Amino acid sequence: MRSFIDQQGDAALCAIGVMVIGTASSYLWNAYMPVYVERQLHLPMKWALFGTFVASSMNFVLFPFAGKLMDRFGAYRLFYPVVITWAVCTLPLFWFIVSAPSGGKLLTAQIIAALFQVAIAAGHPGMLATLFPAHARTTGVALSYNLAVTLFGGMAPLTVTLLTQQTGSRFVPAFYVIAAALISLALVRFTRTGQAALAADRAHRAQRAKVATLPAFPAD
């Protein structure tokens, strides 16, 4: 394990960064939302469960198309604008729900959140696979994925519940997502592996654009 950390520690940090915002958003909007709706918004839990069903159905339908976009434009090139936009939209989205809670508003917010979750998570498999060399890929992906999901996903409902009890604010979930986004951006942007992955995405995109401009010659 020490050898792995010495050789692949930077890549593991980048991989954790890739996962943090996606897993935090998923657990909050899917696992924690029914509790939030009932305790904080005082709406029937059925609204949150229905929204979760709609969001899951959207994931099933949209993931292939989102993955295609990642392949075309580069998952790391799209990661930054998507995560930044999601962080900016999160607080207004919760304000939209909290200001006058209703089933319709909740469903609208869950649909918007689902679109961002698809855009963020669709690139995860490809992004993680390219970070580690073949001899360390399984260990690297497994370790990074499980650490990120456990600390920032599985612990999210407990963390948000405790912070809500301490602060009394109904906007704690929004600030949790924003914090997760900042952690993701920092770990991907400021690791050598993340910088190299972004450069590779840009180079691949430039090569595709160059090939597209070449004249086509008819076959003999």
Name what the model sees in each region:
Residues 9-58, 152-157:
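Extracytoplasmic gate region of multi-pass secondary transporters
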Residues 71-84:
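Cytoplasmic membrane-interface "Motif A"-like loop-to-helix N-cap segments
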Residues 103-119:
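Hydrophobic core of transmembrane alpha-helices in multi-pass small-molecule transporters
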